[in-house]
Curated annotation (Swiss-Prot):
Name used for this protein in its record: Pentatricopeptide repeat-containing protein At1g71490
The species this protein was found in: Arabidopsis thaliana (Mouse-ear cress)
GO molecular function: RNA binding
Family listed: Belongs to the PPR family. PCMP-E subfamily.
PPR repeats: 108-142, 143-177, 178-208, 209-243, 244-278, 279-313, 314-344, 345-379, 380-414, 416-446, 447-481, 482-517, 518-548
NCBIfam families: PPR
Coiled-coil residue spans: none
InterPro entries membership: E_motif, Pentatricopeptide_rpt, PPR_At4g14850-like_plant, TPR-like_helical_dom_sf
Domain of life: Eukaryota
Keywords attached to this entry: Repeat
Presence of the UniProt keyword Oxidoreductase in the record: no
Type E motif as annotated region, ranges: 553-628
Biological process, per Gene Ontology: RNA modification
Repeat among keywords: yes
Length: 681
């Protein structure tokens, strides 16, 4: 029949997006309608046209079809209602869609499912729940396509009470074993942070797909329950279910968070052998793991994959690449990655500046910061958090003051305790302890970092009493010290020879503050006793501590013996330090000085031979001073400066002043460090 032929032709045209020709065919079909059969064909043709209007986003054409349906009196026909609801929902005209459903007599859940799914897609979760309640009130029973959207809405709105109501209706329905419904239930309880119910639902499922496994693994991951997540991942792997890239990323990210960096890289390597391959998230996880363990070779491999996949242009990937190279001390490649992009974001600028700052490349970091300003970017809290610690480490007071002014001019930094702590540290490490205290007094909130910087600053100035008073103020304020704070206090006691105070803190640090002494704390005690001349006690500390002494610990004891003229313990410390074959050339100078003082010339010759064989060479010492005209650099033995004739007599005077105030006599037999190095060279 001609009508059937036109109907088939219309369906073909509509499904292939030829809307204009489909409408022409529809007009011909209407002219041919003269029986009940042809009316039915017209009805289904209108339904096909509405679907085509959705596909090609032809709103006005769809409205014309709707108008025809109204004029024909078939607007609420069971064939057309779902199509009309789909049409209006596709254009986010949900009121029109719901009005059509409400005015129809259809008791099938399909049109409601379409409306509810559209609400959920547009994140109108309150409307999802309202539509579901209206649907149930009309006596329409939900089906397996209704529940997932409603459960998602309950989870997103954290409507625990109604979520349980919906769950209850599922339990008494035939859909309690539906794969999609169970997956939605697990996801909802994940949002409710109810791991118990989520896991029970998962365990009772007869059928599980990748979504099921991902949902419950993600539940555990979101709660930081990584051992359970890892266990389920292994079970998923052995069950034969295809592991999606999302699951790989969740588990490898979990390894990263729990400190299992090698495990994270192992998972990333396994991903490369599967069809999932690496996506940008996986690459970022892998690069972060590489940066944390210094695996630059694998980092370069991931970089190559990023280039091959065109992911290296993604901002987050590029920033992580810069960080990886910086952490692996390969600033050349970090800068190459940075320079490859013409327009860098503020995050990218922060990444490269942070890389140079962490490696104490102050000149390069300052130059990059100036470049960033010229490019029109203003430093944010992350920029300042990178630069200020560098200013503190190199005692760059001038730059610290400039950043202080920058912070003061911007109210947005008022409550950034981390930045104010960094400023306190800059002033303290630059010797401006009064200014550091003034900055801390103006802070709205102080924490253990604030007090640690002040204690360390006063300790280095020889103000051990003030440092102890600050420590008491800190603990009385309810601020709990950490292990770094205790190191600062012990160091302050050491510099001021407050032996009894240091002993008391060391004895009670675990029982009173819950801080177990680590190697740093024991080394501080060695320094405390050594500076005070209690060398036997310092030796006992090393003998009895539960850690293997580091080169720095032996050097501390050795230097104390050198100062106080105790060659017996000094020779013992020198031998122990020499056994470690340290890379620090200054340690060999200490050892050589001790053997020279003890008259052990054969040992001294042995030290010289070891230094020569290992190629140990001490770089000339250098320092700099910040003046109004900029930084002036001083190097050992440098006479090129026009001020050298004035500088060296002043330096000799300062050296003598330090010796006079040190409280001990200089052994005239021993050579200076530089003289010994010249003899060994």
């Amino acid at each position: 029949m001609l009508s059937e032929s036109l109907f088939k032709s219309l369906g073909h045209l509509a499904s292939h997006g030829h809307l204009h020709d489909a409408f022409k065919t529809f007009s011909l079909l209407r002219l041919q309608s003269s029986s009940a059969v042809s009316d039915d064909l017209v009805l289904h043709s209108a339904a096909s046209l509405l679907s085509a209007c959705v596909d090609v986003r032809a709103f006005l054409a769809g409205v014309q079809v709707h108008a025809h349906c109204i004029s024909s009196g078939v607007e609420y026909h069971s064939v057309l209602v779902p199509k009309l609801v789909t049409f209006y929902s596709a254009f986010n005209l949900h009121n029109e869609a719901q009005s059509i459903i409400e005015n129809s007599d259809i008791l099938h859940p399909l049109p409601w499912n379409v409306l509810i799914a559209s609400y959920a897609k547009n994140e109108l979760f309150e409307e999802v729940i309202a539509a579901y309640k209206r649907m149930v009130s009309k006596g329409i029973r939900p089906d397996a396509f209704t529940y997932p959207s409603v459960l998602k809405a309950c989870g997103e709105t954290l409507d625990v009470a109604f979520g349980r109501v919906v769950h209850g209706s599922i339990e008494v329905s035939s859909y309690k074993s539906s794969l999609y419904v169970c997956n939605a239930l697990i996801s909802m309880y994940k949002r409710f942070r109810n791991m118990g119910i989520a896991r029970r639902l998962f365990d009772r499922m007869f059928e599980r797909d990748a979504v099921s496994w991902n949902a419950v693994i993600n539940c555990y991951a979101s709660e930081g329950m990584w051992s359970e997540a890892f266990e389920l991942f292994d079970k998923m792997w052995f069950s034969g279910v295809e592991v999606s890239v999302i699951t790989w990323n969740i588990i490898s990210g979990g390894c990263l968070q729990t400190g299992n960096y090698v495990g994270a890289l192992g998972l990333i390597s396994r991903m490369r052998n599967f069809p999932t391959s690496l996506d940008p998230v996986a690459m970022i996880i892998g690069l972060k793991a590489c940066s944390l363990i210094g695996a630059i070779r694998l980092g370069k491999e991931i970089h190559g994959l990023a280039i091959h996949s065109s992911y290296d242009g993604i901002d987050n990937v590029r920033n992580t690449l810069i960080t990886m190279y910086s952490k692996c001390k390969d600033l050349r490649h970090a800068l190459i990655v940075f320079r490859q992009t013409e327009e860098n974001s503020l995050c990218t600028w922060n990444s490269i500046i942070s890389g140079y700052a962490q490696l104490n490349k102050s000149e390069e970091a300052s130059h990059l910061l100036r470049e960033m300003l010229v490019a029109g970017f203003q430093p944010n809290s992350i920029t300042l958090a990178s630069i200020l610690p560098l200013c503190a480490r190199i005692a760059n007071l001038q730059h610290g003051k400039e950043f202080h002014c920058y912070i003061l001019r911007r109210k947005c930094f008022k409550d950034y305790t981390m930045l104010w702590n960094s400023l306190v540290d800059v002033y303290a490490k630059s010797g401006k302890i009064v200014a550091a205290k003034q900055v801390s007094d103006l802070m709205s909130k102080r924490d253990e970092v604030t007090y640690t910087s002040l204690i360390d600053g006063y300790g280095n100035q020889g103000e051990g009493g003030v440092a102890l008073a600050l420590f008491k103020e800190m603990t009385r304020s309810g601020i709990k010290p950490d292990h770094v704070t205790v190191v600062a206090v012990l160091s302050a006691c050491s510099h001021s020879k407050l032996v009894h105070e240091g002993e008391r803190l060391f004895m009670k640090m675990q029982c009173e503050y819950g801080i177990r002494p680590c190697l740093q704390h024991f080394s501080c005690m060695v320094d405390l006793y050594g500076r005070a001349g209690f060398l036997a006690k310092a030796k006992d500390i090393i003998h009895n501590m539960p850690y293997k002494p580091s080169g720095a610990t032996w050097a501390t004891l050795l230097n104390a013996c050198h100062i106080h003229g105790n060659t017996q313990i000094g020779k013992w410390a020198a031998e122990k330090l020499l056994e470690m074959k340290p890379e620090n050339p200054g340690y060999y100078v200490l050892i050589a000085n001790m053997y020279a003082a003890a008259g052990s010339w054969s040992k001294l010759a042995e030290v010289r031979t070891i230094m020569r064989d290992l190629g140990v060479k001490k770089d000339p010492g250098c320092a700099w001073i910040d003046t109004d005209s900029g930084f002036s650099l001083f190097s050992v033995g440098d006479t090129s400066s026009p001020e050298a004739c004035n500088t060296y007599p002043l330096l000799d005077g300062l050296n003598q002043l330090m010796k006079d105030n040190a409280g001990y006599a200089i052994n005239k037999v021993q050579s200076s460090d530089e003289e010994l190095l010249q003899e060994m060279g």
